[in-house]
């Protein structure tokens, strides 16, 4: 059953915070959490499994801050984040969906900043294409205070 069918049948529960749990497990101030997709995958897998075992139906991959402005190896970072979450699902033997988690790109859009709307759409489209290729079941766009940036992310998700 796909997620849209399941949403029509019942309430689905997301996991909880990831960053605070990574800090509890050693993430240093200023360290980018997404790097742990490659360097500390076992910790991410354990956290995802804890959420699944607690009843989460949707697990957010550790991709919230992953974009071309922060990572030269973006595809590797996102692919590993999705793979870690999928591995956690498989190891529990339970049904859960994996969300590509998209946060702000970290740049201000014009006129307040320097990023053009079309460029913002392109930044988010790249993330979406990588997440889709890696096997994400859905996209979660969160924690954006600029509605123009949110519009760029939604447009990228719809078109890709």
Regions found by a protein language model. Name each.
Residues 1-160:
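Domain-level signal for soluble alpha/beta catalytic cores
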